[in-house]
Amino acid sequence: MTVRVRLGAGLARLSAAPLKTVQLAEGATVGDLFARLAEDEPELAPALRSVLPVVAGEHVTRDQPLADGQELALLLPVSGG
């Protein structure tokens, strides 16, 4: 299956492209996607530990199954004071 990944600003700086198309096996989860991204672009691996995956405006967990054609946004948490 194919999923599209949109990297938020903090992640986009670490990657060659802010929008990616990734091929995964049927039944793959958000965690499987993170593993593939870390394998393809090792510089993303540390940031992926704290990233917030969002599908259709809703935060999802790493065990969330993905569907063919789905688009995810990966956002870094914001902190401040």
Residue ranges and their predicted role:
Residues 1-80:
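Ubiquitin-like/PB1-type beta-grasp interaction modules and other compact soluble beta-rich domains
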